[in-house]
A protein has these predicted regions:
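Extracellular/luminal Protease-associated
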Residues: 130-133, 138-182
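N-terminal low-complexity or amphipathic/hydrophobic leaders
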Residues: 41-126
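Ligand/cofactor pocket segment of small-molecule handling proteins
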Residues: 168-213
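Long terminal accessory segments
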Residues: 41-44, 55, 254-306
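Bacterial N-terminal signal peptides
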Residues: 14-31
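N-terminal secretory signal peptides that target proteins for export/translocation
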Residues: 1-15
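Acidic, glycine-rich flexible loop/linker segments
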Residues: 203-283
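Boundary at the C-terminal end of the N-terminal hydrophobic targeting segment
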Residues: 35-37
Length: 306
């Protein structure tokens, strides 16, 4: 897993104490994030993607409880899928978080010219281009790869469309499997028709463009969505039950426990399908035996044994 480099800050002499304290806090925050990145670095994205393929939110939540993470990582129910297809299950996804935070701008909300006059259109065009290229761009795009979940903290954006139907398709083309956002999604009819997997708070959808409204604050740093802190590299699982975040440091064991629960549940439901004469569907296709699956991927055959 590649993490962005962290800035080195030097305490300068003859500075006000408040300034030095602020730098000290910043160093502490950077050190904490760097420590987390080192802690997580030994876990392969590829193995995690295989482990969580087809995972259900409920099984993952049970896995978190098993390792002592009660009520950790479960996003507020308001973060929900914009659409569902329980025949194909295309609304469901699991993947690795790439994080971005947008915030309200503190710059002038317009270029200063009278935009009601056609002769000022070029002023508007240049101002718009500057905003999208410099202030509210998508620098997180370089981190998107196969299995990425874009996690967007834009909870203070008000009525701003931080993303829409075209942006999401661009990310999918790069390999993203879905978007989890605090809000700020627009072009919703097209998003639904295109079946772009998006989980967001529908009541906080945004309609205005980003220009003059928001800026990129952070990329690949911890963000908060749905009441949960998400670090870059965490595992995200989303289905009709909502969204769960698995901290990278426990992702392997939680994933193994969730896989075992899924296998047990599928076997039990398949038996009931047979007893009641119900036709089998994809939800009762039993996954590979856990021990065999784990061994194939170099994982402990039983995650609950030392």
């Amino acid at each position: 897993m590649n993490y962005p480099s962290f800035p080195v800050r030097i305490l300068l002499p003859n500075q006000p104490i408040s300034y030095l304290m602020g730098l000290l806090v910043a160093v502490f925050i950077d050190f904490g994030t760097a420590t987390y990145a080192q802690e997580a670095a030994g876990v392969s994205d590829e193995v995690l993607l295989e482990l969580y393929q087809g995972a259900r939110v409920t099984d993952v939540v049970d896995g978190l409880v098993t390792v002592g993470y009660m009520d950790v990582g479960v996003m507020d129910p308001s973060i929900a899928p914009l659409w569902r297809d329980v025949e194909t299950m295309e609304h469901r996804f699991s993947g690795i978080a790439v994080t971005v935070r947008y915030g309200p701008t503190n710059r002038p909300m317009h270029p200063g010219a009278d935009l009601t006059q056609p002769e000022n259109y070029e002023v508007y065009r240049q101002w718009r281009g500057m905003w999208y290229s410099q202030l509210s761009a998508e620098p997180f795009g370089e981190f998107i790869k196969a299995g990425t979940v874009v996690v967007m903290d834009n909870r203070d954006d008000n009525d701003t469309g931080s993303t829409g139907s075209k942006n999401i398709m661009d990310w999918q083309e790069k390999g993203a499997v879905g978007l989890v956002s605090a809000g700020g999604v627009r072009d919703i009819d097209e998003v639904i028709r295109q079946k772009n997997p998006v989980y967001t708070d529908y009541t906080k959808r945004g309609r205005g463009e980003r220009i003059g409204r928001n800026e990129v604050i952070d990329v690949q740093r911890p963000v908060v969505v749905g009441g949960c802190t998400v670090y870059p590299g965490d595992v995200i699982v989303a289905d009709s039950d909502g969204v769960v975040v698995v901290p990278r440091r426990v992702a392997v064991r939680v994933g193994q426990i969730a896989y075992m629960e899924l296998v047990d549940d599928t076997k039990g439901r398949r038996e009931l399908f047979e007893k009641t004469g119900r036709a089998y569907d994809q939800t009762v296709e039993v996954p590979e035996d856990p021990a065999t699956f784990f061994k194939k991927h170099g994982l402990p055959e039983d995650p609950n044994k030392p």
